[in-house]
């Protein structure tokens, strides 16, 4: 079994990178997010590997961290989610954003990934909501706000700020994270306009 590869980036395709390890080129499939993080051809990099052995092929999937690899495995535990859909979800949302979307029951954000319809988005939420703690804690500030928003106990200004950012085109997990950071800096009594203004600055970083 291959658990990690370290080598030179040879070239990139739409869904994979060819990694040159001591003269041997390995085709490693990655999410679009991971591919964007890789250095230019000729530079050295390392990827954690998930190897899937099938009757007709052996496929390697690469990840920049253990958390990303764990999410890849966890997503595929849901019926209807294969490697392609799992990578599509990871290309769209970071590990933290995935956890937030599931905690918020945000089917819309999950449904933006190719291959994920409303029914599969609902199944992801139902089957994974109790499994996320095994992957480590989500950012505590964001987690508290997303749970409070789902329960209707978050400050009204915070809820309105999240809605305003979503209406501007941002995903709900990203908006919730930005507002959570803004609340920490400005305080829970911060007015709506200040939360939106600070949230936009956070999202622009």
Swiss-Prot record:
Does the keyword field hold Amino-acid biosynthesis? no
**Superkingdom of source:** Bacteria
Q: In its keyword annotation, does this UniProt entry include Kinase?
A: no
UniProt similarity note: Belongs to the RuvA family.
**Stated name of the protein:** Holliday junction branch migration complex subunit RuvA
GO BP, sorted A to Z = DNA recombination; DNA repair
Describe the function of this protein.
The RuvA-RuvB-RuvC complex processes Holliday junction (HJ) DNA during genetic recombination and DNA repair, while the RuvA-RuvB complex plays an important role in the rescue of blocked DNA replication forks via replication fork reversal (RFR). RuvA specifically binds to HJ cruciform DNA, conferring on it an open structure. The RuvB hexamer acts as an ATP-dependent pump, pulling dsDNA into and through the RuvAB complex. HJ branch migration allows RuvC to scan DNA until it finds its consensus sequence, where it cleaves and resolves the cruciform DNA.
What does the UniProt entry say about where the protein is found?
A: Cytoplasm
